[in-house]
Amino acid sequence: YRQSKFKHEWRDQYLVTHVIYRLKKTYAPDLDYGNIRASLATKNIEHPTAQQLRDVIIEIRNAKLPDPKVQGNAGSFFMNPIVEKAKYDALAALYPGMPHYTIDGEHEKIPAGWMIDQCGWKGKSLGRAGVHDKQALVLVNRGGATGEEIVNLCETIRKDVKQKFGIDIHPEVNVK
């Protein structure tokens, strides 16, 4: 869903109104993503059912993300950048403990939220637009923010991350 013709060449031509999911018949959960395994351990669940896994994921997301009915937001605003291993190694030497996810032998994914937090943006605002206090990937409307204010905050954060880490982060949200 992150990359498709609907986000690129068909962006202004089509509106998706329905989807069909093709689900696997065999249940094979990925428990190594984020805090899933730790959350399951606190509940003494070793082999979760699909329902238990769903409940844990919803619990994790609700703890980190603001309710859009209460505070305007579009969820994760930035994509996590994938960098070459040499770039990651150089940054890891400067920032021990920097989180990352190995993509393959030549690439690492660095959490954009971590970089935004390291730039001091978590919980901060620029005008009426701000960065959520629990998840730096989420930009929020503090009340009455315009699209221009959200874009200005986005671009300011992108500039700060580029200056500090030498990495371009890109919005996941389509902004016009």
Question: Could you describe each region identified by the protein language model?
Answer:
Residues 1-148, 164-176:
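Phosphate/pyrophosphate- and phosphate-bearing ligand-binding catalytic cores of soluble enzymes
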Residues 161:
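Conserved ATP-binding N-box helix of the HATPase_c
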